[in-house]
């Protein structure tokens, strides 16, 4: 049985920093569901991925990068839905790459990852989050909390007191005879 090769959808975003290599990265998400034994070849100039997906699908893509990346520092993770890469740019620069690929073509399978995208002029103001998942619980200390509330003081508040039932103030309902009962009431 011959498998048709498909090009997977690829999402990308980037950060740039001329002083900190850790903030000079490309985030790349290659959408291959249920990737089976993916073959990944990462060089400074390009990324080549070839993988089966499930029983009937085959995916392959080659991305020739706009500039070189640092292969030694770069890393990836394979999940059940995609392959996620953090690729470190080799050249430290403040400006964003104008595009991911060398070619100035509009590639139908390549899209901006707006979940990870930050505008070039706003990237320093963004909090650092783990690229491999949600950043955990946010810091709520700035919200001020409950203002030192002492819950032990709630016991002295009024309301229905001990032994007093709130339903005592309502009139009693008359008991109704059961209709259709075979038993004789005495």
Swiss-Prot record:
GO term, biological process aspect, one: chaperone-mediated protein complex assembly
Bias-annotated ranges (Acidic residues): 165-180
Any one GO molecular-function label of the UniProt entry: protein-folding chaperone binding
CDD domains in the cross-refs: p23_hB-ind1_like
Pfam families (UniProt xref): CS
GO cellular component terms attached to this protein's record: cytoplasm; cytosol; nucleus
Location of the CS domain: 5-101
InterPro entries, A to Z: CS_dom (IPR007052), HSP20-like_chaperone (IPR008978), p23-like (IPR045250)
Ranges for region Disordered: 121-186
Keywords noted in UniProt: Cell cycle
Functional description taken from the UniProt entry: Cell cycle regulatory protein that interacts with cdc2 in the control of the M-G1 transition.
UniProt xrefs under PANTHER family: CO-CHAPERONE PROTEIN DAF-41, TELOMERASE-BINDING PROTEIN P23 HSP90 CO-CHAPERONE
Record-stated family: Belongs to the p23/wos2 family.
Record-given protein name: Protein wos2
Protein species of origin: Schizosaccharomyces pombe (strain 972 / ATCC 24843)
Gene: wos2
């Amino acid at each position: 049985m011959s498998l048709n090769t498909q090009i997977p959808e690829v999402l990308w975003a980037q950060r740039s920093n001329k002083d900190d290599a850790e903030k000079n990265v490309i985030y790349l998400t290659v959408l291959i569901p249920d990737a089976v034994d993916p073959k990944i070849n990462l060089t400074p100039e390009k990324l080549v991925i070839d993988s089966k997906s499930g029983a009937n699908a085959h995916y392959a893509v080659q991305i020739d990068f706009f500039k070189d990346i640092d292969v030694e520092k770069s890393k990836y993770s394979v999940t059940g839905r995609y392959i996620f890469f953090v690729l470190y740019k080799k050249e430290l620069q403040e400006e964003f790459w104008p595009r991911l690929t060398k070619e100035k073509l509009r590639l139908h399978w390549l899209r901006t990852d707006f979940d990870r995208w930050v505008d070039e002029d706003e990237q320093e103001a963004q909090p650092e989050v783990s690229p491999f998942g949600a950043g955990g619980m946010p810091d709520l200390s700035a919200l001020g909390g409950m203002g030192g509330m002492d819950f032990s003081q709630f016991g002295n508040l009024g309301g229905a007191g001990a032994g007093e039932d709130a339903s005592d103030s309502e009139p009693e309902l008359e008991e109704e005879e059961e209709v259709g009962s075979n038993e004789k009431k005495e």
